[in-house]
Regions:
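Non-catalytic, C-terminal membrane-associated alpha-helical segments of glycosyltransferases
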Residues: 152-227
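Acidic donor-binding segment of Leloir-type glycosyltransferases
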Residues: 1-13
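Conserved nucleotide-sugar donor-binding
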Residues: 92-107
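A short, conserved alpha-helix in the catalytic core of glycosyltransferases
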Residues: 102-105, 112-142
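Conserved donor NDP-sugar-binding/catalytic core segment of glycosyltransferases
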Residues: 12, 46-82
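Short beta-strand-to-loop acidic/aromatic patch adjacent to the donor-nucleotide binding site
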Residues: 34-46
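A short, glycine-/small-residue-rich helix N-cap motif at loop->alpha-helix starts
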Residues: 11-22, 112
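Active-site nucleotide-sugar/metal-binding loop of Leloir-type enzymes
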Residues: 21-37
Length: 227
């Protein structure tokens, strides 16, 4: 049948990462292998007309395109403004669309904070291309992180550790994100989360080889911005 609704219960806590992917995976488990594109969309989005058709057109255009998405906009005093938390080459976690083979190559989505970064890093590791379309303006009704609870504040630093960023890249990424959110003190939470994860010896989300690729890619992107 065309549509199947699943009812899944969990705690009322708003914690980034695992809960949303557990819900996604529950739906994924209902699928057979007869699909070409798989999407992970949040429920608080309003898409422009022909969003899906435009996404499909990109996948048809180039077989090496593995991940496509538009941009999230939030309501600020009655005006829809770009939710500017990431680089323009990043597809936000709220609106991911994957080619099946790319989705298989990256091993699906990780049940962890940072899942919406590691997916793109692993896609590039497997030589897939990522496309973002500025013309696809998606209204995001609940700004990212607005309802996260206190337990979530160290999760970002934990994610940087589990992505094998290393301390220097973590410091740079933490400072950038804290400034983008206009919450400078978040920087300290991110760094504390990194060291808590290191002390706890939490498992990494990527292999040593993948981690080496990720660090090289991050340094390359930073150098490109400076030059």
């Amino acid at each position: 049948k065309f549509l199947n609704i699943l009812n899944i219960s969990s705690s009322g806590e708003h914690i980034p990462g695992s809960k949303v992917i557990n819900a996604f995976n529950a739906g994924l488990n209902e699928l057979d292998e007869n699909y070409d594109i798989i999407c992970k969309f949040d429920a608080d989005l309003i898409f422009p007309e022909n969003y899906i058709e435009t996404i499909i057109s990109y996948f048809k255009k180039d077989d090496r395109i593995g991940l496509v998405g538009g941009f999230c906009f939030i309501d600020k005093n009655g005006e829809w403004t770009l939710e500017n938390l990431t680089n323009e080459d990043h597809v936000r976690g709220a609106l991911k669309a994957y080619r099946k083979n790319c989705f298989k190559d990256i091993g699906g989505l990780k049940t962890s904070m940072g899942w919406d970064t590691v997916d793109e890093l692993l896609a590039q590791y497997h030589n897939w291309q990522i496309v973002t379309d500025k013309k696809l303006k998606v209204k995001h009704l609940k700004p990212t992180g607005k309802t996260y609870n206190k337990k979530a504040k160290y999760k970002q630093g934990e994610a940087f550790y589990r992505l094998r960023y290393g301390l220097i890249i973590t410091i740079i990424a933490s400072l950038k994100l804290a400034l983008l959110k206009r919450k400078p003190l978040f920087f300290l939470d991110y760094i504390k989360g990194y060291f808590q994860a290191k002390k706890a010896n939490l498992p990494f989300l990527v292999s040593e080889k993948e981690g080496e690729f990720i660090r090289k890619l991050r340094w390359k992107k930073m150098k490109e911005k400076l030059l």
